[in-house]
Amino acid sequence: MQIKQIEGALSAKDARFALVISRFNDFIGQKLMEGAIDCIRRHGGSEDNITIYRCPGAFELPMVAKKAALTGKYDALITLGAIIRGSTPHFDVVAAEATKGIAQASLETGVPIAFGVLTTENIEQAIERAGTKAGNKGFDAALTAIEMVNLYRNM
């Protein structure tokens, strides 16, 4: 007996994506968006198959992602933003709720939603993860979305 293995290819050809981006810490979100679009392009995707939704902050990402997923227009979504620790517990609340909400939206809709939201201790760490020393986490999230689209297609 041979074990069957199913996985997703890294081809964005004909895949439709929604990018849901937090405007808070927008200069970081912009860099993450550029990374995600670059990834989709490099893997055969078309800008014509990308829609961008902008919301006020990371707390709103799950709501917008779920509504976009429910339209049936997208094969996958990519959530992008930056939550940077400050001097109050606000960071912990927003980071936890955004993370849980995005996962819940994906589970409830059955549409893959990739998590490209940075949670960092300071602005320097966010900048590093948005295209400098630590790569671009928007690119990485898009790569996850591409793989998930193809995995779902193969199931």
From Swiss-Prot:
Name this protein carries in UniProt: 6,7-dimethyl-8-ribityllumazine synthase
Substrates-to-products reaction catalysed: (2S)-2-hydroxy-3-oxobutyl phosphate + 5-amino-6-(D-ribitylamino)uracil = 6,7-dimethyl-8-(1-D-ribityl)lumazine + phosphate + 2 H2O + H(+)
Listed SUPFAM superfamilies: Lumazine synthase
Xref: InterPro entries: LS (IPR034964), LS/RS (IPR002180), LS/RS_sf (IPR036467)
GO annotations of cellular component type: cytosol; riboflavin synthase complex
Species annotation: Chlorobium luteolum (strain DSM 273 / BCRC 81028 / 2530) (Pelodictyon luteolum)
Electron transport as UniProt keyword: no
Binding site for 5-amino-6-(D-ribitylamino)uracil: 24, 58-60, 82-84, 115
Enzyme class of the recorded protein, top EC level: transferase
Family: Belongs to the DMRL synthase family.
Entry's Gene Ontology molecular function annotations: 6,7-dimethyl-8-ribityllumazine synthase activity
